[in-house]
Amino acid sequence: MRSLWIVLVLVLGSALLLQVMAASDDRIPYARFRSLAERGELAEIEIRDDMYIGRAVSGLSARAPQSYRTGRIEQTEKDLLADLDRRGIPYTRVADELGLPPYLWLLLPLAGLAAMGHLASRRATTAGTISGAATAFGKHKARLYEERGAIATFRDVAGNAEAKTELSEIVDFLKAPERYEKLGGRMPRGVLLVGPPGTGKTLLARAIAGEASVPFFSASGSEFVEMFVGVGAARVRDLFSQAREKGACLVFIDELDAVGKVRGLGGSVGGHDEREQTLNQLLTEMDGFDAHTAMVVIGATNRAEILDPALLRPGRFDRRVHIDRPDLAERKEILAVHARKVALDPGADLDAVAAQTAGLVGADLANIVNEAALLAARRGAEAVGHGDLEAAIERGLAGLERRGRRLGAREKLVVAYHEVGHALTASLLPTQDPVRKVSIVPRGPGALGYTIQQPREDRYLWSRQEILDRLVVLLGGRVAEEEAVGDLSTGAQDDLLNATELARRMVRELGMGQGLGLSALEPRRPLSFLGEAQGAMPSGAGPRECSDATARAIDAEVARILADAEARARALIQGHRPTLERVAARLYEVETLSGDELREMVASGEA
């Protein structure tokens, strides 16, 4: 190969040298060029950008050059052209396409051949490493934690008492697998943690490994699937191969639904083949556990309904543990765990914070404590006070306070009436949660005011009357605007959307409508053509499971429920109009009212 390149360079170099020598033979001084023209030895002349080229008259001499070149002199060109005209020698002007010497054109093919040779040699030198690069691409991306200090324990997991009890068997198995082998028992090879986002599924999995003092492999389902078919399966094989080398260990796959969705519906589109191959390999690896394999696979998802049934059969993820939202006692424990990391003022009441955060998950509570610490640091405090915690709660519920957004006097008054309409109807209906705060300070991207209600206790069931009263509260703001100002605004848009959705669910899903019987008319969430369950849709937005006549009856019943709620809200507002005016005026003045102030003003109006 090298000798071939040497010969090629010599040949091209010789051709280049001959071209240069040939070009230099016909170049003559300008005076001689003029003399040849005067003697009539030039048949025609080309005028180039930087030279004259004269073609010799044929037949003068066999040894004479066929053409002559000389440098162009623009100062004497006028005389030269006049002389050529007198002698009848034709001339033409020719523009150079590229200002390159002729010999450089020989270098262009040489450069091209050199580039091709370089690429060929580079490909030859790297051919031996391609297989190594492909192997590296198929390596898993899971993080390995082996030091006990890097892994959590059950003490770091507040709440979830039932889940920890359920998973303690896994810890015992990882610590002493021989005890189960002696009895002929087999622990579940896979455990599926199911729960809403932020409930602590990942932390709980790490705590299992920490309690058992075993290596912990942590990966996300999306890390297995790539655009190249076969890469995900290779990564699964590599992960389980390394896990087996560790002996007793725990493999955690977060967001399992990214790789474990239902297979086979609708054919293959895009990366569907790659995901299915990855899932098939995962199923194969879990089938390969023998009785002496002290390895447990834990998966976590918040979308268990879209997982492939093969993942959930016995021998794979056959134990399912639900991680639910924390109740009041668990929220207290979670807040106490996170509060240990900040300087907390003795006056901060974590019990009150737990009571105000019903429905929030552990990640939300951790964020509240962190936001409170940031707010305390911003005001230069030495400890996090209760006010900082409440401000952090409101920031999470309603958004960032925007005192820089100034409302006009009329808009501010309309917002005040609107929020007092919500607060007043909620205070007058005994089934509704008490109001904790009313404000007309803008928050978030679009909220011009807000009313916060604090649940008396954790709730899991709601009666029909409670839902109907909730509709009254939702429509109370709009009714108060209309009664007090005499007009309607766009501020009730979200209230109308929420009220319509709630009324439609009463009729379609809960059997709480009149004249429609007990049929549940809301279809289950359908699977898309890829096998993925469609996301949450408003009630009635999916395919209908009823006739056109029933659909019209549903719409009529929803309209009736909303009309009744509006009439009840109007009766409450009209019956307590002085209280509405007094509370709205006070809110307009101070911009924020606490729940105690509101209840005191409502009670004084009742007296």
Swiss-Prot record:
Broad EC category: hydrolase
Topology, Cytoplasmic side: 1-2, 121-607
Transmembrane portions of the chain: 3-23, 100-120
Cofactor note: Binds 1 zinc ion per subunit.
UniProt GO cellular component terms: plasma membrane
SMART domains registered for this protein in UniProt: AAA
Active site (UniProt): 419
Binding of Zn(2+), residues: 418, 422, 495
Bilayer disposition of the protein: Multi-pass membrane protein
Cofactor(s) required for function per UniProt: Zn(2+)
Binding site for ATP: 195-202
UniProt cross-references to InterPro entries, sorted A to Z: AAA+_ATPase, AAA_lid_3, ATPase_AAA_core, ATPase_AAA_CS, FtsH, P-loop_NTPase, Pept_M41_FtsH_extracell, Peptidase_M41
Oxidoreductase among keywords: no
Residue ranges that the Swiss-Prot or TrEMBL entry lists as coiled coil: none
Side of membrane Periplasmic, spans: 24-99
Keywords recorded for this protein, A-Z: ATP-binding, Cell inner membrane, Cell membrane, Hydrolase, Membrane, Metal-binding, Metalloprotease, Nucleotide-binding, Protease, Transmembrane, Transmembrane helix, Zinc
SUPFAM superfamilies linked to this entry: FtsH protease domain-like, P-loop containing nucleoside triphosphate hydrolases
Enzyme Commission number(s): 3.4.24.-
Gene Ontology biological-process annotations: protein catabolic process; proteolysis
MF terms (GO), sorted A to Z: ATP binding; ATP hydrolysis activity; ATP-dependent peptidase activity; metalloendopeptidase activity; zinc ion binding
Quaternary structure and interacting proteins, as annotated: Homohexamer.
Function in brief: Acts as a processive, ATP-dependent zinc metallopeptidase for both cytoplasmic and membrane proteins. Plays a role in the quality control of integral membrane proteins.
Family: In the central section; belongs to the AAA ATPase family. In the C-terminal section; belongs to the peptidase M41 family.
NCBIfam families (alphabetical): FtsH_fam
Name of the protein this chain belongs to: ATP-dependent zinc metalloprotease FtsH 2
Origin species: Sorangium cellulosum (strain So ce56)
Lineage per the UniProt record: Bacteria, Pseudomonadati, Myxococcota, Polyangia, Polyangiales
